[in-house]
């Protein structure tokens, strides 16, 4: 679904990513892990087309991509749940969900029934302002908003950060549901090891802006992978 070859990325004169070869396939959850400052979020931005790469190539469904505007991202079937959630605090839950309509044809301006099935708290709080929700509820709202776009590629940046355990478990169930539903590639940047290990089909571990190890989840002993991630 999405593939990079020799990807490099700079912020000013500082090189952040060094020759990244990466691939995420439909029907799989591909997890990017590593300690703080290893380039995980920068790689996600390069995949999303929201930050220009310095070198190498990125292909989405076999077609090269450059820096993309939100409308172009949606047209390519790409949705992002960024770190920090980025919901609109003064809009209601329903209005936040409806902001996804701006990136869809008018015929698709509806909230799918499975959104409220997967996130019942959003149905209960449909008229409450986004800023009044807890951090976990805001994260559910951000994921639901991305799902309304019916993406073929879903990118999530540390969705468990600062979230209470019961909502982390629910988010895990949602990602497992989306994977089983098919037709979507999921890329997950995550630092919560147990959450990632339970869900991911494929791992990339970054160290100092480069891939240190990668491979299918069943290739790794749990303790060995944990040790790689913590270096």
What would you call each of these model-derived segments?
Residues 154-158:
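Catalytic Walker B motif of ABC-type/P-loop ATPase nucleotide-binding domains
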Residues 146-147:
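ABC ATPase C-loop
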Residues 33-35:
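The feature captures the beta-strand-to-loop junction immediately N-terminal to the Walker
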Residues 48:
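Helix-to-loop junction immediately C-terminal to a conserved catalytic motif
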Residues 129-133:
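Conserved ABC ATPase signature
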């Amino acid at each position: 679904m999405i593939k990079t070859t020799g990807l490099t990325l700079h912020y000013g004169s500082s090189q952040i990513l060094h020759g990244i070869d990466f691939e995420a396939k439909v029907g799989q959850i591909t997890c990017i892990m590593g300690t703080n400052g290893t380039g995980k979020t920068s790689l996600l931005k390069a995949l999303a087309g929201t930050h220009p790469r310095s070198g190498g190539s990125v292909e989405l469904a076999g077609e090269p991509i450059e820096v993309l505007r939100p409308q172009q991202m949606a047209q390519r079937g790409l949705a992002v749940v960024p770190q920090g959630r980025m919901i609109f605090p003064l809009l209601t839950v329903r209005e936040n969900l409806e902001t996804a309509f701006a990136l869809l044809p008018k015929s698709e301006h509806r909230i799918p029934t499975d959104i409220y099935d997967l996130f019942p708290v959003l149905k209960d709080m449909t008229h409450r302002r986004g800023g009044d929700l807890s951090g976990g509820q805001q994260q559910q709202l951000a994921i639901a908003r991305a799902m309304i776009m019916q993406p073929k590629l879903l990118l999530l940046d540390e969705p468990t950060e600062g979230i209470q355990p019961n909502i982390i478990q629910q988010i895990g169930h949602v990602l497992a549901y989306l994977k089983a539903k098919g037709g979507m590639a999921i890329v997950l940047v995550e630092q919560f090891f147990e959450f990632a290990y339970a869900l991911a089909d494929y791992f990339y571990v970054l160290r100092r802006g480069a891939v240190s190890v990668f491979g299918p989840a069943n290739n790794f002993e749990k303790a060995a992978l944990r040790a790689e991630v913590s270096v």
